[in-house]
Amino acid sequence: MSVPNKTTVLVIGGGPAGSYAAAVLARENVDTVLLEAEKFPRYHIGESMLASMRFFLRFIDLEEQFDAYGFQKKYGATFKINSKREAYTDFSASLGPGGYAWNVIRSEADDLIFRYAGEQGAHIFDGTKVDDIEFLSYDGADGANFTPAAFLVNPGRPVAATWSRKDGTRGRIKFDYLIDASGRAGIISTKYLKNRTVNEGLRNIANWSYWKGAKVYGEGSDQQGSPFFEALTDGSGWCWAIPLHNGTLSVGVVMRQDLFFGKKKAAGSPGSLEMYKLCLQSVPGISGLLEDAEIVSDVKMASDWSYSASAYAGPHFRVAGDAGCFIDPYFSSGVHLALVGGLSAATTIQAVRRGETSEFSAAKWHSSKVTEGYTRFLLVVMAVLRQLRKQNAAVITDDKEEGFDTAFGLIQPVIQGQADTGESEQQRMVAGVQFSLERFGQATPEAQRALLDKVQFAGQNAEELEKLTADELAVLHNIIGRQLKMTKVEKNLDNFTRDVIDGWAPRVERGKLGLQRADTSIMTAEMKDLFQLNRSLDSTKAGIQLPA
């Protein structure tokens, strides 16, 4: 089949965000075309999945097929931050006893989801690169509302795209809606909006390779076979060791870019393999796993800068996954955030097509949702990386605690992806984000504890938010505002469906996908404003930086 001349929704990019969005829309009987620049299967890094992935796959009936493929089971993850005892995040907390996610070979996992989107009815084409997007002015009744204040932009409405292939074939396709899931290339953000901002505190560089014959981490313990993340002893970065189902161990080092090149220069500018092995000398735990192993691939290197954008939506377009934002992969958040963005894009497009809400409201919901997810991980990652770089200073733990159990207990709903999927208590969610903020010194601990008490109490007494001082409001604007009413329910995408933004909540049901009015009768106007997710922290403006 050749690329059609017209479609309802054009998806750019066949990674997790794009393929998932295409599968969701196709199952809603929406004419969907997916164009992927690379020929699948293609190599990609980012091999460790979060517990939340099961729930996203379950919604599109892909969970059983994905599980049967044979990917390495992941029951949790282990983190060695300094000389204290390792921290372990157990997936049974969100998946039940014996529950697991997976470590995957991304070329195979991404291809599986990409092909599945085609099986569900999407028209999928790999080796087909989108070169340009055509826009028409958008002068709708709500056009003036697409402003930076609403975390939106109005470059016009995209109406067509031109594409090309390596064999010289070219074409043009018209569409009603566009989802940009083009990965780091981010055609909308980088070529047209030019609104991408790099987080200066997270300019890192990654070097990695694959090993055969490595020892198994935690052999004989309940953490046996766990992915292992270990801080470099000099505080310059961290290292991953992720076991894969083909018998290899993925081992990579993430370092601050300036420190990496400084170390390389001091060592006489060694080659990539020698430099990689030099860095591994700073992770005794992982080096021990590699004692009798052999390296079986070239050393790969990539910039690992974290970035975000000022908006992730506009008239008739949505941006999802790495096309919009990327956060340091310490907690393996990439695919999780991609799936959240893909589902949000599909949901908000359907809400408009079904006549449930305006294009402005739907676009704002999506941009707010993407901002919220990125910010939540940003806060937690930066708190932990601050501890990692400070090594034995008491940053996320106190001097008397032997490990990091308290810290990881608080941030668990974030780092397992529970905030968007299975059950999670409001107190734990707010406490986890609050815990991270305290570690940045955004306010005194006393002030933040007092504010936390008010925020937690607000679920029962909305009037409390009207009593916040100007200083407290400033701190609250740095907290991921959420109005969550959590009850014990079946583990699925219930937290995603309970996200109320501007009075709208998602309806995640096959055949009924869209947005619906939520009951906000108990919320005052000020409370609604404070808890809008688009008030999430902007990393650049807030000036959150890690210590040198």
Swiss-Prot record:
The keyword Oxidoreductase applies. Its EC number is 1.14.19.-. It catalyses: sulochrin + 2 FADH2 + 2 chloride + 2 O2 = dihydrogeodin + 2 FAD + 4 H2O + H(+). FAD binds at G14, A17, E47, V335. GO terms for molecular function: flavin-dependent halogenase activity; monooxygenase activity. The keyword Flavoprotein applies. GO terms for biological process: secondary metabolite biosynthetic process. InterPro entries: FAD/NAD-bd_sf, Flavin-dep_Halogenase_NPB, Flavin_halogenase. Pathway: Secondary metabolite biosynthesis. Pfam families: Trp_halogenase. It comes from the Eukaryota. Keywords: FAD, Flavoprotein, Monooxygenase, Oxidoreductase. It is an enzyme of class 1 (oxidoreductase). Belongs to the flavin-dependent halogenase family. Sulochrin halogenase; part of the gene cluster that mediates the biosynthesis of geodin, an intermediate in the biosynthesis of other natural products. The pathway begins with the synthesis of atrochrysone thioester by the polyketide synthase (PKS) gedC. The atrochrysone carboxyl ACP thioesterase gedB then breaks the thioester bond and releases the atrochrysone carboxylic acid from gedC. The atrochrysone carboxylic acid is then converted to atrochrysone which is further transformed into emodinanthrone. This is Sulochrin halogenase gedL. It comes from Aspergillus terreus (strain NIH 2624 / FGSC A1156). The gene is gedL.
